[in-house]
C-alpha cells in the first residue's frame, strides 16, 4: 500500500489533515474530539468500528516524543486498510478478529507540547518567554503541556506518592517535564483522556512513548494475572523487554490510572532506541519492528 503517513515531522495541522484524509478514505473510521488543550487545540480521536469494547492507543503525551504520533497513524492506516478490505495484517484477518470490538486512537494527546518541541517559542504564545527560559532555548526536549505540567504525571494514581518522589528528586515547579502539577487531573489534556475512558468501554490501553524498547505493564496489585499474561505476549511479538518504573516515573501516569481505576490491563510501551527526541526519519523502521505487537495488542 502507498503510505499516507511518512517518517517526517508533523505539526498540529499536518496531523489533523492526515486524520481527515484517512477518515475520508475508510468508511470504518470516525473522527471525534476527545477534548481541547490549554491553547484550545483539538485533541482528536479516531474510532475504528463500533464495538462493545475497545482497545485504546494514545500517543504523544510528551512533546519530544512526537514521533509516536507518526507510529500511531501508521498503524491506524494499515489497520483500517485491512479492516475495510477484509484483509490481514501480520497474518491476522482484522475484520474477523475485531468482530464485536473496536479500536480508538488518540495520535496526539499533548498537541501544545508537540508544537513547542517542533517549532519553539512561536508555538508558545504568551508563555514564549517563560518557556524559552525553562528549557534553556532548546525546545526539542520540551515534554510538558503549555503550562509546564507533565501530562503523564498528572493522572490520579498514587499522586501523593508521586509528589513525594518528585520532591526527593528536586522537582518542585512547572518546567519542560516531570512535574505533575499541584493536583491530579488539573490539565485539560488529562481530563480529555479520563473522560474518554469513562465514556467508552475500554478493555485495555497502550500508552505510546519513546524510548528503550521496553514494555511497562500493570500497576500495584491491580489485574496482575491478566496484565502479566498480555505483557508476555506483547514482549514475545516485539522483542521488547518487560519492566516496571521506579522513582518519579512511578505513579501519576495514564496507564497507572487506567489500571487502578478500572482494574483492567494497561501498558506503557517505549518505542525505539536512542535519546529523545528520536529521529523522526526512523518512524517507519520503528513501526515495522513493532507492528506485530501493535496488531496483537489491538485484538487481545
Predicted features, each with a name:
Residues 52, 66-67, 74, 80-219, ...:
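Active-site/substrate-binding loop(s) of hydrolase catalytic cores
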Residues 45-52:
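Short beta-strand-to-loop junctions in surface cap/lid or active-site-entrance loops
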Residues 31-34, 86-94, 243-247:
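Surface-exposed patches in mature extracellular/periplasmic domains of secreted proteins
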Residues 21-32:
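A domain-start/cap signature at the N-terminus of enzymes
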Residues 1-18, 25, 159-300:
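C-terminal accessory segments enriched in acidic
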Residues 54-62:
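Short beta-strand element of the alpha/beta-hydrolase
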Amino acid at each position: 500500500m502507498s503510505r499516507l503517513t511518512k517518517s517526517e515531522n508533523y505539526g498540529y495541522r499536518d496531523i489533523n489533515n492526515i486524520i481527515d484524509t484517512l477518515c475520508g478514505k475508510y468508511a470504518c473510521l470516525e473522527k471525534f474530539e476527545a477534548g481541547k488543550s490549554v491553547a484550545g487545540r483539538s485533541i482528536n480521536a479516531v474510532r475504528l468500528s463500533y464495538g462493545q469494547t475497545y482497545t485504546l492507543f494514545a500517543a504523544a503525551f510528551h512533546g519530544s516524543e512526537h514521533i509516536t504520533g507518526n507510529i500511531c497513524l501508521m498503524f491506524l492506516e494499515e489497520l483500517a486498510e485491512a479492516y475495510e478490505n477484509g484483509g490481514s495484517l501480520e497474518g491476522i484477518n482484522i475484520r474477523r478478529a475485531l468482530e464485536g470490538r473496536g479500536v480508538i486512537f488518540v495520535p496526539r494527546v499533548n498537541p501544545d507540547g508537540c508544537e513547542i518541541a517542533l517549532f519553539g517559542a512561536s508555538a508558545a504564545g504568551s508563555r514564549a518567554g517563560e518557556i524559552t527560559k525553562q528549557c534553556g532555548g532548546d525546545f526539542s526536549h520540551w515534554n510538558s503541556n503549555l503550562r509546564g505540567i507533565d501530562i503523564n504525571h498528572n493522572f490520579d494514581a498514587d499522586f501523593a506518592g508521586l509528589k513525594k518522589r518528585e520532591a526527593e528528586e528536586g522537582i518542585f515547579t512547572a518546567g519542560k517535564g516531570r512535574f505533575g502539577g499541584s493536583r491530579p487531573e488539573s490539565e485539560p489534556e488529562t481530563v480529555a483522556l479520563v473522560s474518554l475512558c469513562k465514556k467508552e468501554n475500554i478493555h485495555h490501553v497502550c500508552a505510546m512513548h519513546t524510548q528503550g524498547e521496553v514494555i511497562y505493564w500493570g500497576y500495584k496489585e491491580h489485574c496482575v494475572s491478566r496484565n502479566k499474561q498480555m505483557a508476555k505476549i506483547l514482549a514475545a511479538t516485539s522483542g521488547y523487554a518487560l519492566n516496571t518504573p521506579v522513582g518519579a516515573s512511578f505513579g501519576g501516569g495514564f496507564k497507572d490510572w487506567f489500571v487502578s481505576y478500572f482494574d483492567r490491563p494497561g501498558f506503557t510501551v517505549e518505542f525505539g532506541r536512542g535519546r529523545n527526541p528520536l529521529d523522526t526519519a526512523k518512524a517507519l523502521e520503528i513501526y515495522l519492528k513493532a507492528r506485530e505487537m501493535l496488531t496483537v495488542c489491538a485484538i487481545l
